[in-house]
Design a protein with these regions (language model features):
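Solvent-exposed beta-hairpin/edge-strand motifs
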Residues: 115-128
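C-terminal beta-strand-rich structural cap/linker in extracellular carbohydrate-active enzymes
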Residues: 133-149
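Short, surface-exposed beta-strand/loop "edge" segments at domain boundaries and coil↔beta transitions
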Residues: 97-98, 130-134
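Residues that form or immediately flank small-molecule/cofactor binding pockets and catalytic motifs
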Residues: 22, 128-129
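Loop/helix patches that line or flank the sugar-binding groove of alpha-linked glycan CAZymes
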Residues: 1-99, 107-110
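Surface-exposed beta-strand/loop patches in extracellular or lumenal glycoproteins
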Residues: 105-118
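Ordered hydrophobic segments in well-structured contexts
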Residues: 87-89, 97-103, 125, 141-146
Length: 149
C-alpha cells in the first residue's frame, strides 16, 4: 500500500496551512487546489498564538532549552526501553550530567519504571502542568528530566 502512496504523490498527507478562521483558513484568497481541513476554524496558527499552552509555545520552550543546555546537542545518546511499544525513551550524557527524555505515544496511562529511577531529577519540561501518579505516564505525556546539574 505504501508503494502506491509514494507513486501517486504526497498530497494525501498535506493540507493548506491553517493561518486563521477566515475563508480558506487564511491560506489564499483564491481557490485552493487542495481542500482545507474542516477543523481550520478551531485549529489554526492565530488560535495557537492566543493559547500559552499551545504546541507553538511548547516548541519555543524546547528551542530555548536547547540553547541553554549543551546536553541537548552534545554527548552520548542511549536508547532505552527498546522493546516497549508504548514508550519512547532515551538518555543523553555529557560532562557527568544526564538528561532523560520520555514520551508515552498512547491514549492510555502506562507504567514507566524509569520514572522511579529519575524521581530525584529536575523536571525541565512536561506537557502536563500538574504532577501525575508516581511511576506512570499519562496519555501522550512527554517530559525531560535532568540529573547532575
Amino acid at each position: 500500500i505504501m508503494e502506491s502512496i509514494y507513486t501517486k504523490g504526497r498530497d494525501n498527507a498535506r493540507t493548506p496551512m491553517q493561518w486563521d478562521d477566515s475563508v480558506n483558513a487564511g491560506f489564499t484568497t483564491g481557490i485552493p487546489w487542495m481542500e482545507v481541513n474542516p477543523n481550520y476554524t478551531e485549529i489554526n496558527a492565530e488560535k495557537a498564538l492566543e493559547n500559552e499552552n499551545s504546541v507553538f509555545y511548547y516548541y519555543q520552550k524546547l528551542i530555548q532549552l536547547r540553547k541553554e543546555y549543551d546536553i541537548f546537542a552534545e554527548g552520548d545518546f542511549r536508547l532505552l526501553l527498546e522493546e516497549d511499544e508504548n514508550i519512547f525513551a532515551y538518555v543523553r550524557e555529557y560532562q557527568g550530567k544526564q538528561m532523560l527524555v520520555v514520551a508515552n505515544f498512547t491514549e492510555n496511562t502506562v507504567p514507566c519504571t524509569l520514572l522511579k529511577e529519575w524521581q530525584d531529577g529536575e523536571v525541565l519540561i512536561c506537557n502536563y502542568s500538574e504532577d501525575g501518579e508516581e511511576g506512570m505516564l499519562r496519555p501522550y505525556e512527554s517530559a525531560i528530566y535532568l540529573c547532575g546539574f
